[in-house]
């Protein structure tokens, strides 16, 4: 028997420790989160994507009584990115994404300077659901270094990569497809 293991790296940061580009994504995700429509789960989520050339696109979750018709915030942002990037003749390759989620109607105060965070476990940080991690993976052009930022409900920012958040993905490469070539 052989054992294969992997370490998952997540950094907990104050807003001031982020780059200006990361700060913009986190602020955008937090702002658009307040537009969510979540009458059933009462959990509002906002997402912001930065594509390869620096454009930022956002989205929020919109629920319907038929759960399969619900649009996740990450999907909404990506749909906007695809539409706008395709107008320019480009594919929407995700460079970084920020996600902010929390109870309906509550604003999350962004911690801008040093503050002691609560003791947390790694599985308490939900960067995205499995469905959205798959969407992010495929639209990162299978680049494991795409940055994911999570505005926690206590105001700190957690930073990881899609490779760490989704360590065993199934994607185009498993089917022998070079996603960059097939989208030209």
Predicted regions and their residues:
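C-terminal binding/interaction regions
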Residues: 1-38, 85-184
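Short acidic-glycine loop/turn motifs at beta-strand connectors
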Residues: 51-55, 152-154
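Short, electropositive, low-hydrophobicity segments enriched in small/polar residues
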Residues: 50, 63, 134
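Short solvent-exposed loop/turn micro-motifs enriched in small/polar/acidic residues
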Residues: 40-42
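Short beta-strand scaffold segments in enzyme catalytic cores
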Residues: 44-51
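Short glycine/serine/threonine-biased micro-segments
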Residues: 44, 57, 128
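Helix-adjacent hinge/juxtasegments
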Residues: 55-101
């Amino acid at each position: 028997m052989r054992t294969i293991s992997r370490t998952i790296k997540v950094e907990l940061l104050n807003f001031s420790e982020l780059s200006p580009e990361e700060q913009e994504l986190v602020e955008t995700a937090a702002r658009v989160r307040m537009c969510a429509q979540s009458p059933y789960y009462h959990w509002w989520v906002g997402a912001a994507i930065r594509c390869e050339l620096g454009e930022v696109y956002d989205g929020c979750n919109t629920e319907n009584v038929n759960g399969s018709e619900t649009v996740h915030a990450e999907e909404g942002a990506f749909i906007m990115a695809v539409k706008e990037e395709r107008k320019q003749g480009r594919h929407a390759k995700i460079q970084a994404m920020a996600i902010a989620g929390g109870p309906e109607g509550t604003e999350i105060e962004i911690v801008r300077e040093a503050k002691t965070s609560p003791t947390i476990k790694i599985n308490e940080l939900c960067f995205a659901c499995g469905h959205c991690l798959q969407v992010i993976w495929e639209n990162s052009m299978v680049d494991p270094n795409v940055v994911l930022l999570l505005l926690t409900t206590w105001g700190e920012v957690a930073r990881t990569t899609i490779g760490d958040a989704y360590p065993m993905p199934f994607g185009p490469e498993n089917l022998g497809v070079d996603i960059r070539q097939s989208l030209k």
